[in-house]
Amino acid sequence: MSDKNIYKGVNTICTHVGQVKDEQFGGSVSPIYPGTSYEYIDKEIDRYPRYSSTPNQEFLAKKISALEETEDAIILGSGMAAISTSLLAFLNSGDHIVLQNDIYGGSRNLVEAQFKRYGIPV
């Protein structure tokens, strides 16, 4: 059973889910790792920021997943990364997108300039 299933309250989930023991200094909360380069001890795990697999991304994904009661979560570097990932995951050639007039300019540009190539008109 995953630890996200044993904690119920929002505050408890935010505090405990995904927590790792600070072996080096014995801290009471999970450490934050400011680095972007990691030693590859376990060759089965690719640690690289663009794979959303750094320790910070993994801890945060577990917390978000528990809060949203989902199987998993992905942590991205920007809102545009989230928007483009979401749209590209669900849209196929021949689908249509309807946008509101005052949508964020970066989103409008992505959809109008790039999605046309994939046969997804606005």
Give residue ranges: language-model regions.
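Structural motif
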Residues: 31-32, 72-74, 95-96, 121
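Short, surface-exposed connector motifs at secondary-structure boundaries
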Residues: 67-70, 91-96, 116-118
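Short conserved active-site loop signatures built around small residues
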Residues: 2-32
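Conserved N-terminal alpha-helix of the aminotransferase class I/II PLP-enzyme fold
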Residues: 33, 37-84, 106-113
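Conserved PLP-anchoring active-site segment centered on the Schiff-base-forming lysine
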Residues: 89-107
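Solvent-exposed alpha-helices and their adjacent loops that cap or buttress functional pockets
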Residues: 24-27, 65-67, 89-90
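PLP-dependent aminotransferase-class I/II
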Residues: 112-122
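Catalytic cores of large soluble enzymes that bind and process phosphate-bearing ligands
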Residues: 52-56, 99, 103, 122
